[in-house]
Amino acid sequence: MARFFLEDDGKTDLANATRNDLLRRLGLVDGGGRLTNAGSLLFVETPNEGLDYIRRQVSGGDSTHRVRGGTRPLVVQFYEVEKAGEIANRLIHIPRGFVHRQIRAIPSRAFREAIVNGVTHRDWFSPDRTFVEHVGDRLSVTSPGGFLPGITPENIITHPPQPRHRSLAKAMSRMGLAEDEGIGVDRMVIEMLAVGHPRPGFAEIKGPSVRIMLFGGDPDPVMIDFLSSLNPRELSRDVDLLLVLDHLISHGWLDTGAASSATQRTSLESEEILGRIENVRVGGGELIVPVSGAPTEPSKAYRLGKAAQRRLEHRLETFRNIHGRESLILNWAKSRGRVSSTEVSDLTGVSKPYAGKLLTELADRGLLVGSRPHKMGRGYHYLPAAEESTSQPD
């Protein structure tokens, strides 16, 4: 089975090696030629139940297929679970000119990486299995053992590689089953966002166990074409750019603080990322531009450029109705500490008089307060109502 994966990954030389040489080059034998624990897991048996895959069409529905790995060699369990998942994972045809591109409802590389993560980072001393639940176009992989010390859902994308079983992770990488050590989570994020799906979810649940969630579905051909038209092109697969773009689409704007949270990087790193993305172009215009009228302190704030907004209009519809606009305004005011009609006009695309009307209505409902009693004069703006007592006079 290992040779099958190696051939599939184009590693013909390693696939044709003798058994002893293969094990040695995979790092699965010690100096005396004896199998390591990782080697035993992969090619002999798992100490407890390994993988358990279940397929359902809808949440709560009857299972239509199940693969119980038991304690068979992990490489066999992995092959059978991945094969079952591949059969159940819808293949969607995306027309592009005179050709059609085929994409799985859950991108194959993200699907594989989620399962790899569920076996390389799990607690193999636990009697619980790694449970792979495939419901519709959604995948969840729950593995026993919580996050290792220092790792949280808020830093898992950028945390230095820290596999629970390093030799197992290295062997699976060398066999072509996993990405190079330390970029598996990045790969899941890239594969999902690049076709318009939500970013993967990561959580520690009671047990403790770690759960990875992939929310697939029909790929977004507009998003795929949009990313392919970025200049420079190579940034279309840049994890930081994809995370920034995802945040802009869902929130309408971001600054260094929001970028830091979205990319899971420091403020200094986020400033560099935004500076780099400022130079990216799409459709003859900038991908992101500074928000007009917004103070540059404590940090610059950005929105999508006009060309990008036109291309991604179908994903920005929430900001075209009154509820979406009000939510954006209040989020901006709370995060930035103030909001003006110039900022609202630039963020939502409405005229300045209408932006002023929106702000007045929010103030009348007690959600905003004016920066001074009389709504006149240059620099007049609004503050979040909850922060009225801490505001400083102009």
Where are these regions (language model features)?
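A short, conserved structural fragment
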Residues: 254, 274-294, 363-374
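Short acidic, hydrophobic short linear motifs in intrinsically disordered regions
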Residues: 250-262, 335-348
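ATP phosphate-binding glycine-rich loop and adjacent ATP-lid/helix-beta elements
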Residues: 155-195, 230-238, 242, 265-275
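Short, cationic-aromatic polyanion-contact patches
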Residues: 289-323, 373-394
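Short amphipathic alpha-helical interaction segments
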Residues: 263-277, 284, 350-361
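Active-site helix-to-loop segments that bind/position phosphate- or nucleotide-bearing substrates
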Residues: 1-128, 134-140, 145-162, 175, ...
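Short alpha-helical segments that sit at the start of domains
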Residues: 220-243, 305-332
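Short amphipathic alpha-helical elements of helix-turn-helix/winged-helix folds
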Residues: 84, 243-251, 328-336, 347
